[in-house]
Design a protein with these regions (language model features):
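Histidine-acidic metal/acid-base catalytic patches
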Residues: 1-27, 53, 80-81, 86-88, ...
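Active-site-proximal loop/turn and secondary-structure-junction residues that shape catalytic pockets
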Residues: 9-11, 35-39, 63-66, 94-98, ...
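N-terminal substrate-binding region of glycoside hydrolase catalytic domains
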Residues: 22, 26-41, 59-66
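Conserved beta-strand positions in the central sheet of alpha/beta enzyme cores
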Residues: 32, 59-61, 91, 130, ...
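Glycine-rich, proline-tolerant flexible connector loops at the mouths of alpha/beta enzymes
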Residues: 32-51, 98-103, 138-139
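Catalytic-core regions built around general acid/base machinery
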Residues: 43-53, 114-124, 180, 220, ...
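Short hydrophobic interaction/assembly module
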Residues: 49-73
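Active-site acidic/histidine proton-transfer and metal-coordination neighborhood
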Residues: 67-163, 173-174, 248
Length: 264
């Protein structure tokens, strides 16, 4: 299975131009850039450089945050950027609680309505929207869609042009995971993100592990994903303030490739 680099993995060491070059040198065939990195490089130059290296843009990170005040304009720009980069999907980190509110049900309804509002624009642009459920520990601040089941309920309600990004870090614990991956199937599984869950976890956001260093049964989840019809890239996404962000980025990419072959 082909490997893609989510650029968060080396964001503290390299800019986007260096990441694109690094993927080419390490024969990593896919890349999933973050919008701030694209903006820093310039959209046109990023598009040109990615194409010159024959990289597949497996996703653009990110749209979402539908509970924020300025969500609409930013998401419309994100769709446009994803279209220009020919991204296979626009990843949505949907947003946490409405500011000042404790009503998680209301927040989830607002998220559903926001996605419904931008979906016709995304369909017209040919950009699939990928809802990424986040671990419940991030429900308040980042995403109050926390399981594949919740995400797929929205997908089923809204129809075509929308699916899920299955990030093992966020969903490995879910007792319904196998069932919901099967439910998603080839149509809804738009992205598959890999890393590992460390014990102990020292930070709620930035202490992900390299594949093989934690407790996630990656081969098992891979078998479920592939059994459901997914044949796309495996996208490594590691936020690691205390470890991998401090290492030489070429070494990080080398280990990513090695662990993908041996642990996933």
């Amino acid at each position: 299975m082909k490997l893609s680099l989510n650029t968060a993995t080396v964001r503290k060491q390299w800019n986007l131009a260096q990441m694109i070059d690094g993927c080419a040198r390490h024969e990593i065939q896919g890349i999933s850039p973050w919008r701030d990195q694209v903006a820093q490089m310039g959209l046109s130059q990023a598009k040109k450089s990615i194409r010159e290296q024959n990289l597949t843009v497996t996703g653009l990170c990110r749209g979402g945050f539908f509970t924020a005040k300025d969500w609409k304009d930013d998401n419309l720009r994100a769709v446009e950027e994803a279209h220009e980069l020919q991204a296979q999907c626009l990843v949505l980190v949907v947003g946490g609680l409405i500011p000042g509110s404790k009503d998680i049900s209301l927040s989830r309804r607002k998220i559903r309505d926001g996605i419904a509002e931008i979906l016709p624009v995304a369909r017209k642009a040919g950009v699939p929207l990928a809802i990424e459920p986040l671990h419940p520990m991030q429900a308040a601040e980042r995403a109050c869609i926390n399981t594949l089941e919740q995400a797929l309920d929205i997908c089923d309600e809204l129809g075509d042009g929308i699916g899920v990004a299955c990030d093992v870090y966020h969903v490995w614990w879910d007792p319904k995971l196998q069932q919901q991956i099967k439910r998603a199937g080839k149509k809804r599984l738009l992205a598959y993100h890999i890393c590992d869950w460390l014990v102990p976890t020292r930070d709620l956001v930035s202490d992900r592990g390299m594949m093989g260093d934690g407790v996630i049964d990656l081969p098992l989840i891979r078998s479920w994903v592939e059994g459901a019809g997914y044949s796309g890239f495996h996208e490594v996404e590691i936020f690691s303030e205390l470890d991998w962000w401090k290492k030489d980025p070429d070494e990080v990419l080398r280990v990513c490739k090695e662990r993908h072959n041996t642990c996933c």
